[in-house]
Amino acid sequence: MARAKFERTKPHVNVGTIGHVDHGKTTLTAAITMTLAALGQATAKRYDEIDAAPEERARGITINTAHVEYQTEKRHYAHVDCPGHADYVKNMITGAAQMDGAILVVSAADGPMPQTREHILLARQVGVPSLVVFLNKVDMVDDEELLELVELEIRELLSKYDFPGDEIPIIRGSALKALERMQANPKTQRGEDPWVDKIYELMDAVDSYIPTPERDVDKPFLMAVEDVFSITGRGTVATGRIERGRIKVGETVELVGLRETRSTTVTGLEMFQKTLDEGIAGDNVGVLLRGIQKNEVERGMVLAKPKTITPHTQFESEVYVLKKEEGGRHTPFFAGYRPQFYVRTTDVTGTITSFTADDGSKPEMVMPGDRVRMTVELIQPIAIEQGMRFAIREGGRTVGAGVVSKILK
């Protein structure tokens, strides 16, 4: 048992492989697990085990994602790999598997391709903070100059989408060659095979270049209100799950969204009918609020540390629109479409005022299955921040999912 306890002392980081179809994302994922399995720090996974990704549902959308876990000397990782391009788009937009950093896989034989570009853009828009590049299939390219050109092209593309193209580590290797060596000799250690060493080199880069994320408990307090009731003689209680941060009795919080923002003091905290000194991220709590009437709080508001979040009505977002087969709309929609936007705990009506495609063109309409950037105007202000996820609903069913990329008003 001591061992399991020791493992939990390592910081946990969520990563994933992104990049164009057939550039070797899944092969690389398999190579990483097999390489680290030789150190007893992962369970080796075959390509077909990862490729047969289980279905998940996130914000009403079915996504195929495979999760593997492994550790290095420094950290414990959860790694997500999606089989299809559409699954990546959906996963990144819904945040089904939130990534603290990603490994961008680019085939040296092909260079950056359309999905390479799209995944970099998505990573930027949905807030994946850092990328490391694995230049794969270098065994198929004899020309050093060609490799340097491909690297240059990748760095320019990264810079174009506001990643630090000049400093991002690019590791050259061959996931397939490393995998073949590990399959031939599963005990291969560092220093025994040049291709396997490239996998170690990649993991060193991931360890050092992708920062350890700030834990949710260390972020400013936020709780979306799910329910409200009053306790005779004591006041009004708002219940919900603490999304981030921590809260103690006596602290000041703001009620944000739907109405004028107002301040109040926490006079009591309860969890499972017991009083609590401090609530932390992940707890489902009841918060007793001083001087607030039951009719002044409603579902859809948030309780937050003062001055950390503000109410807004207009924003830009990256959106995936569900296909008919996914339970989405059967017909396209046009600018002026007015669905519900489900944010945290509530639906708010809003108008989609305009949309643009990736290349900056303005399509006349949005078809089921499309990914677009859209500008939204809500009829009521609610607490919104960049990187926040939401669902688009119509008559109670999900027709799209999105992430806020920019606040306008």
Curated annotation (Swiss-Prot):
Monomer. Residues 10-214 form the tr-type G domain. Its EC number is 3.6.5.3. Residues 136-139 are annotated as: G4. Its main location: cytoplasm. Residues 81-84 are annotated as: G3. PANTHER family: ELONGATION FACTOR TU, MITOCHONDRIAL, ELONGATION FACTOR TU-RELATED. PROSITE patterns: G_TR_1, G_TR_2. GTP binds at residues 19-26, 81-85, 136-139. The keyword Magnesium applies. The gene is tuf. This is Elongation factor Tu. One of its GO terms (molecular function) is GTPase activity. It catalyses: GTP + H2O = GDP + phosphate + H(+). It is an enzyme of class 3 (hydrolase).
